[in-house]
């Protein structure tokens, strides 16, 4: 039901911090799936608890653009612990989440207290309130983004749409894509392997790749030449009867 192995569940329940009355998180599920929630609650010992996580409304249509967040790894902590990251932190892994990690990341609150044997606070020694991350506003039009994504569907393509008057980017699409919500909720090994081994490379962000413009750039250089007065638009620069053919100097040496 949750695509979590029995071994993983036993490992979580056997963690050193777990007490008889502890709530041990096993798996995140999307809120609102009432049927699954009802099925889970029929299992003895299972409880549901709300948590605050990223939600990506456009799903796969903007997956490569938004990117996703994940829990920090041990390697992350080695590099970032002095910046306030800890074992329960999340970090942007790709897309806008990664590019604007410093702006989007909230600051955890801290409270240091003296408590009695029953856990009641006697004195607060230090307190730092939590701070939300900043809002980052983009010019992406959700409808344009979804339409562009649907046009290409499963084809390995990329597309961009801009407002020609302002230069604002209205859509950035890479297909096929992936749903970033899967990374937030956690995916099974089988699902991860399927994404990784898919021949169409849904994890590849094609719109950030570089592409050689080739002959499509000739029109631009010609326009610049005409605008600068170097090229006469009425002059025929074509040469009849001449052609180019590669010679031995173009031989590929393996």
List the predicted regions and their residue ranges.
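Short, internal active-site loops enriched in acidic
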Residues: 165-166, 243
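A glycine-rich, coil/turn loop motif that links secondary-structure elements
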Residues: 168, 210-213
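Residue-level preference for non-acidic, small/hydrophobic
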Residues: 38, 65, 148, 167, ...
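Short hydrophobic alpha-helical segments used for membrane anchoring or interfacial signaling
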Residues: 159-164
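Short, glycine/proline-biased beta-turn/loop segments that scaffold the active-site neighborhood
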Residues: 173-175, 183-186, 212-254
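Extracytoplasmic/periplasmic proteins that interact with beta-lactams or build/remodel peptidoglycan
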Residues: 1-158, 173, 178-205, 210
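Residue-level signal for well-ordered, solvent-exposed loop/turn and beta-edge residues enriched
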Residues: 120, 167-168
């Amino acid at each position: 039901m949750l695509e979590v192995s029995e071994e993983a569940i036993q490992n979580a329940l056997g963690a050193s911090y777990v007490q008889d009355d502890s709530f041990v998180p096993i798996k995140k599920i999307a809120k609102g799936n009432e049927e699954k929630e009802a099925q889970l609650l029929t299992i003895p010992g299972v409880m549901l608890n709300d948590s605050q996580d990223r939600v990506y409304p456009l799903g796969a249509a903007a997956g490569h653009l938004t990117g996703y967040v994940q829990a920090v790894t041990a390697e992350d902590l080695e590099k970032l612990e002095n910046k306030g990251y800890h074992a329960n932190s999340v970090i942007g892994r790709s897309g806008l989440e990664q590019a604007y990690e410093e702006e989007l990341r909230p600051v955890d609150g801290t409270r240091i207290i003296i408590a009695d044997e029953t856990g009641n606070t006697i004195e607060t020694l230090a307190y730092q309130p939590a701070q939300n991350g900043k809002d980052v506003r983009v010019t992406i039009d959700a409808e344009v983004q979804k339409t562009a994504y649907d046009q290409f569907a499963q084809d390995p393509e990329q597309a961009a749409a801009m407002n020609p008057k302002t230069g604002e980017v209205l859509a950035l699409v890479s297909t096929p894509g992936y749903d970033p919500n899967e990374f937030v909720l956690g995916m099974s090994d089988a699902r991860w392997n399927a994404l990784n081994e898919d021949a169409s490379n849904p994890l590849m962000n094609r719109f950030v790749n570089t592409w050689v413009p080739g002959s499509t750039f000739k029109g631009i250089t010609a326009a610049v030449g005409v605008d600068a007065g170097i090229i006469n638009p009425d002059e025929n620069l074509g040469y009849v009867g001449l052609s180019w053919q590669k010679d031995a100097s173009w031989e590929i040496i393996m």
